Amino acid sequence: MNGMSTGTLVLLRHGESEWNALNLFTGWVDVHLTDKGIAEGKRAGELLLEHNLLPDVLYTSLLRRAISTANIALDTADRHWIPVIRDWRLNERHYGALQGRNKAQVKEKYGDEQFMLWRRSYDTPPPPIEAGSEYSQDTDPRYANLDKVPLTECLKDVVVRLIPYWEDTISADLKAGKTVLITAHGNSLRALVKHLDGISDEDIAGLNIPTGIPLRYDLDENLKPLNPGGTYLDPEAAAAGAAAVANQGGK
């Protein structure tokens, strides 16, 4: 596709991480993929190949689990050579003082209502993390150019940091007709899908994005989806994965 023709967007949530497997709030903590997560990255690359969906450029966060998933997927799809742009604005939502804590234990201590407010409400952030504490990123060198490193975020904060980056940077590649792969995180991708599909602040609470399954959006010249909600390359696995995400916090 050339010129101002429709771009193709592929969203990919990183494969299962070590803290996903342990049911811990992760946020900006930089954890590794599990063996399952590595396999999910490989399967994502196989799906890209099967659907002849070959990215021209990759955008990722600054976090290892997204970077590793993208590297595995692109290597599998023989697209390891494409240009890569990494940016903190694609990072997972910062979970504040909840980072490193077990979701089931937080739910048990604070109750279902407070747990769901922190986890899924649009504008209620968890308590801020203490600067300098074990799971804070305020001294992390990768964020040295930020005026202020977040100590907590709600989904609204992710929207505020991400959508200008989408409009100012990523959109140019799509408007040029490129196939753009964004490999990121549950909440940064939820923020972008909210924007693309015009999902309300209330309804976004019900959107769950599974790990490791590419989600395709075909966009018109105004970057509006021609296929609202996107199209998962493996719909059955995506439905099962989204249900598993929704159930996090259970014992």
Swiss-Prot record:
The record marks H185 as: Transition state stabilizer. HAMAP family: PGAM_GpmA. Its EC number is 5.4.2.11. Pfam families: His_Phos_1. Belongs to the phosphoglycerate mutase family. BPG-dependent PGAM subfamily. The gene is gpmA. The keyword Isomerase applies. It comes from Rhodococcus jostii (strain RHA1). InterPro entries: His_Pase_superF_clade-1 (IPR013078), His_PPase_superfam (IPR029033), PG/BPGM_mutase_AS (IPR001345), Phosphogly_mut1 (IPR005952). Catalyzes the interconversion of 2-phosphoglycerate and 3-phosphoglycerate. It catalyses: (2R)-2-phosphoglycerate = (2R)-3-phosphoglycerate. Substrate binds at residues 13-20, 26-27, 65, 92-95, 103, 119-120, 186-187. GO terms for biological process: gluconeogenesis; glycolytic process. It is an enzyme of class 5 (isomerase). CDD domains: HP_PGM_like (cd07067). Pathway: Carbohydrate degradation; glycolysis; pyruvate from D-glyceraldehyde 3-phosphate: step 3/5. The active site is at H14 (tele-phosphohistidine intermediate), E92 (proton donor/acceptor). This is 2,3-bisphosphoglycerate-dependent phosphoglycerate mutase. GO terms for molecular function: phosphoglycerate mutase activity. Keywords: Gluconeogenesis, Glycolysis, Isomerase.
